[in-house]
Amino acid sequence: MRLDRFTSKFQIAISDAQSLALGRDHQYIEPVHLMVALLDQNGSPIRPLLTILNVDVTHLRSKLSEMLDRLPKVSGIGGDVQLSSAMGAMFNLCDKIAQKRQDAYISSEIFLLAAIEDRGPLGQLFKELGLTEQKVSQAIEQIRGGQKVNDQNAEELRQALEKFTIDLTERAEQGKLDPVIGRDDEIRRTIQVLQRRTKNNPVIIGEPGVGKTAIVEGLAQRIINNEVPEGLRGRRVLSLDMGALVAGAKYRGEFEERLKSVLNELSKEEGNIILFIDELHTMVGAGKGEGSMDAGNMLKPALARGELHCVGATTLDEYRQYIEKDPALERRFQKVLVDEPTVEDTIAILRGLKERYELHHHVEITDPAIVAAASLSHRYVSDRQLPDKAIDLIDEAASSIRMQIDSKPEALDKLERKIIQLKIEQQALSNEHDEASEKRLRSLNEELNEKEREFAELEEIWNAEKAALSGTQHIKAALEQARMDMEFARRAGDLSRMSELQYGRIPELEKQLDLATQAEMQEMTLLKNKVTDNEIAEVLSKQTGIPVSKMLEAEKEKLLRMEEVLHKRVIGQKEAVEVVANAIRRSRAGLSDPNKPIGSFLFLGPTGVGKTELCKTLANFMFDSEDAMVRIDMSEFMEKHSVARLVGAPPGYVGYEEGGYLTEAVRRKPYSVILLDEVEKAHPDVFNILLQVLDDGRLTDGQGRTVDFRNTVVIMTSNLGSSRIQENFAMLDYQGIKEQVMEVVTKHFRPEFLNRVDETVVFHPLSQDHIKSIAAIQLNRLANRMEEHGYQLEVSDKALELIAQVGFDPVYGARPLKRAIQQSIENPLAKSILAGSVLPDKKIQLIVNNDQIVAHQ
């Protein structure tokens, strides 16, 4: 008999039966081998068929194993197995039954029907189990749904809805869906479209993270609770699993067959099913090959006739890119636009979800934490949408607290490591017998005993606190289950069970929870089980790098003494340092304008007076690293076309995918100092781009993304008017010099640019005393570099004064000083070190001899 007369599943089962016979040293493939192979096969229709017939599959499997054990074994046959005569007869009978049923192919369930008619041991076993030809035929009709077997893959396409969809109404019944708060208008509009006679297919469109899928889940929950119009009551909402539909479709036409079987089953349900297609744009082009039809085109006829009640969900960009390009598909859907919820709506949504997250993480989420998550994420996370970004903050903050409870607290962990370290030292000293070692051992033993006692006390506290925290978790879980049971009872109309739960079990559990929570309220030493606004702020700071957590006393003190810290590196520029320090303090105190950068400054002054140095010092103060500064040399942007490098090339140009130099840097580090050095050398068009940054704290890059500059300090430096400063420094005060410089600046920059800068600061030329202070800083850095190599450097006052005189130049500022230090100190020292005339252990003194600085050791 030809194997290609069997369905593909049946062919695989025959191969499995052959392997089974071979493995058990049987010479012939008997019907029992094939029956075992069909039972064990993944996705075979035999198991569901036997379940319909109320047959205990486990009992049947053990009986078949006994039959296999009784078959004769033959050794040394070289792996040659053949079909037995009983098997051949069974196949002939299968062929006969298939022809009677007008099937083009022989499917697996036909073998079960043939086995019942068989007079062999397999037929006898089925008769004992009470199976008759009539019963099996009825069950086969039920599984097939009135379909003939006209395709080799017919078995795979059966029960397509169970295989390729997820039942959202069933999940809602089981309480597996999160509650949907608000969104009443959108759900009502969706129901309104579903009630139409034709084109009753809403497509929910919105930005990622605004809650499109949640609207469909809300619809499923309303259907379960009978809170929908009469026309939608009793409907099922099924979510199409595109992954399952495409996975394993190896040959052309297989994907289309699967989709067609889903559509056929949906049409049989006669409008009782609402099909939800998440990421609707994936249907356009899915399964598209040369000469084949894609999924979108296969859906069109069913959508137009109103046979298929479909709800789609996709983002605005993907709707424009895929759906709008196909007007025939677009007109079959009705748009339901979903906007981002407000901060107030988000707080309501988070309050509704709070219990689910508390139950999952076994921690308590306070109301200030919910308010902080909504407001802080709205202000500081600009590239994502509410409520998704706020839920993420709550989830991660709760996760971090749970992690601290489950793992050892930091204090306990440090103490344990210290004890291990002391024990290693104790072991090493116990082998030594000199007086010093014995003395050290005695003090070590005392220290070790003290640490172990401290560790034992802390561990006891930790275990007690852990036990106290876990007490409420069981009560919360039981309370959640009781509420779910009450909901089931309400739907089933079981009033006695409902009242028993509502007035007995639930109030009792709530009372227990109150008592347990009060016990937990006692002050914890090591652990905490509450998510507060502090934890939310910490998580946000880690995600974005923006410091939004409450300031510790040390940080407040540091900010109040900010000028003092900056003056240690920036000498003689009092006004500039004050202006910058005030801007940072305003920002950290929360008083700065939330729609503008923290501060925008234009630093003017001659070369070498500390304009760039102040930016570096500020970055170091704020981030403990000068690398946190985004430095852009504006002399690179002298040509008109180079402006595109800041925000990224426009579409169609090379480098479009790479993004802009400025925008990408700020997207990666939203909290940073941006230094636009030598700004007057840039092309005038660059300033048109900066207007938006300085005014609204935002900039749109080449790919249309909005980049947030509200947490940056923008500093621009320029040498404009430096000649006026040099000429009038001795004669005019600071205000007079500033007016002189601004005359030059207003001729170069446009008024709308200068008007948007917060402060224009004029830097003073440096005096002899300033240069001396800078020389001390520079020589201190040199001493630190030498210390790394084991040399100690000491500078005499006379040497310091001499180097300040040599390096002083009122025109070029502090830069000549660097050159003077290199020539007079660093070069001779390098020669001395290489020659070996100075030694690492002894102190090197820089002294003046005959107006020359010499190294003396």
UniProtKB/Swiss-Prot annotation:
GO biological process, one term: cellular response to heat
Residues that coordinate or bind ATP 2: 605-612
Gene Ontology CC entries for this record: cytoplasm
Region of interest: C-terminal: 766-857
GO molecular function annotations of the record: ATP binding; ATP hydrolysis activity
PROSITE patterns: CLP_R, CLPAB_1, CLPAB_2
Assembly and binders: Homohexamer. The oligomerization is ATP-dependent.
Role of this protein: Part of a stress-induced multi-chaperone system, it is involved in the recovery of the cell from heat-induced damage, in cooperation with DnaK, DnaJ and GrpE. Acts before DnaK, in the processing of protein aggregates. Protein binding stimulates the ATPase activity; ATP hydrolysis unfolds the denatured protein aggregates, which probably helps expose new hydrophobic binding sites on the surface of ClpB-bound aggregates, contributing to the solubilization and refolding of denatured protein aggregates by DnaK.
Protein name: Chaperone protein ClpB
Top-level taxonomy: Bacteria, Pseudomonadati, Pseudomonadota, Gammaproteobacteria, Vibrionales
